[in-house]
Design a protein with these regions (language model features):
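Short beta-strand/loop motif that positions the catalytic acidic residue
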Residues: 129, 134-137, 141
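Conserved alpha/beta-hydrolase "acid-adjacent" motif
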Residues: 17, 142-148, 171
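Gly/Ala-rich beta-loop-alpha elbow adjacent to hydrolase catalytic centers
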Residues: 80-89
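Post-His helix in hydrolase/transferase enzymes
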Residues: 172-186
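Short alpha-helix in the alpha/beta-hydrolase fold that links the catalytic acid
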Residues: 21-24, 122-123, 145-154
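Acidic catalytic loop of the alpha/beta-hydrolase fold
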Residues: 116-117, 139-144, 168-169
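Catalytic histidine neighborhood in serine/cysteine hydrolases
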Residues: 154-171
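Serine-hydrolase catalytic machinery in alpha/beta-hydrolase-like enzymes
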Residues: 2-78
Length: 204
């Protein structure tokens, strides 16, 4: 049984299969006891793989889908998102801290992310988000400029920000993968210790 299960959310017009390829080098570098759970966005129209469209059309459907997925089990310990999937990860992190919250997960990793501009979402980011987070941004990113990813990171209380010289990609070099692997290892140890404690409490 894996110590951690991480939900992986693809970018706009991406897919689970595409994200698996994009994450191949990162996946090889992270702890072996982390299970990566790749999913496709709920189809908002025929042949569509976006989480929402212009004007945030489809957001409500995606939100309800994500809440159901995260609540249905087996457990999801954290969320990884790329591009629009990273923006969705930020929104889910904000929903996690609403009260009462429909979501429970322990960390968030966002690559090439940005903050929602939907007026209805402003209240979700009224306070700094406390969920531990990693934010990866490329200084040469022409699709989601680095400043937008840094603005998303600023919504979090204690973000780990990793900058790289490249564009709108999931980097596979050690300068990026090593700190992410270390971040995940911390949660892997925490989860393992928690399960061991739960097991000892259940012994007669």
């Amino acid at each position: 049984m894996p110590d951690l299960r991480m939900l992986c959310l693809h970018g706009y017009h991406g897919s689970a299969a595409i994200l698996r390829r994009q994450m191949a080098q990162l996946a090889a570098a992270i702890p072996a006891d982390v299970e990566l759970v790749y999913v496709d966005a709920p189809a908002l129209s025929a042949g569509d793989f976006g989480w929402w469209h212009e004007g945030f059309r489809g957001w409500e459907r995606t939100r309800d889908w994500a809440v159901e997925l995260l609540g249905a089990g087996p457990r999801i310990d954290g969320i990884f998102g790329f591009s629009q999937g990273a923006a969705l990860t930020g929104l889910l992190a904000a929903l996690r801290e609403s009260r009462p919250s429909p979501l429970e997960f322990e960390f968030a990793i966002m690559v090439g992310g940005f903050t929602s501009t939907m007026p209805q979402h402003a209240a979700l980011f009224r306070h700094k988000l406390t969920v531990p987070s990693v934010h990866v941004t490329g200084r040469a990113d022409a699709i989601v400029p680095s400043r937008d990813s840094l603005l998303l990171a600023d919504r979090f209380a204690d973000p780990l920000v990793i900058e790289h010289p490249g564009g709108h990609v999931i980097p596979g070099d050690d300068a990026v993968t090593a700190p992410i692997a270390g971040f995940l290892a911390r949660f892997s140890r925490d989860q393992g210790a928690a399960r061991a404690l739960d097991g000892s409490r259940s012994d007669p």
